[in-house]
Amino acid sequence: MNLMNRRTWLLSAASLAAALVVPFRAAHAHSPYRQWDIFRKKHLQILTSRSDLEGDSIGDEWVALLLERLPLSQAMVSRARDMRRVASLLKTDQAKLAVLSHSDAKAMISGGAGFEDYSPIPLQIMLDNGTHVLVARENLPLHHAYVVTATLLEEARPLHLRVPLDGQLGMSVHPGARSAALGEALEMPSAEAA
């Protein structure tokens, strides 16, 4: 092989390798999901929806109280574009808590109009203010539900909050919320276990 053919061949081989490797690397590039998982573990996120302005405002009020009383929770509102996105995030366990109107909660639990693709979602009720509920996935740790509920119940009268002990809207009450409402003592896990 002469020098010119060798250069042409090497250039062609390098181009072919680049054409094959670059798309492979792009398809297997760094994923943000690990950081998202870490973020979710560091911050107490309560989902609301931009399509429910009243629920979003309620979420802001509840999160402000949680931040004031539980600053280490790093509580924050996470706003989804619509209720279908809220359902998707709850269904796939990317979120643990959400503020839902009574009608959205009923529809989400029953797989009603707009939520057929997401039913069943394993949700339990924690709090009700008369128009909206705070719901949690069934796998929300007992002590997390207890602390959130107990903290919000400190302002139960001005926030019009109650824990529906018998369940509501087709959901059972979260055991941690029940314990907080009844004033039961709950042994918190050690820092190593949490």
Question: Residue ranges of each PLM-predicted region?
Answer:
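N-terminal export signals
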Residues: 2, 8-30
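Short helices/loops that flank or line small-molecule/ion binding pockets
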Residues: 60, 83-98
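An extracytoplasmic/periplasmic, membrane-proximal ligand-sensing/linker region
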Residues: 157-194
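Short, well-ordered beta-strand elements
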Residues: 40-52, 78
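A bilobed periplasmic-binding-protein/Venus flytrap-type ligand-binding module shared by bacterial periplasmic
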Residues: 48, 126-144
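Short helix-initiation/N-cap motifs at beta->coil->alpha
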Residues: 71, 76-88
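Short, polar/charged alpha-helical segment
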Residues: 55-71
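A ligand-binding cleft/hinge motif common to bilobed small-molecule-binding domains
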Residues: 95-116
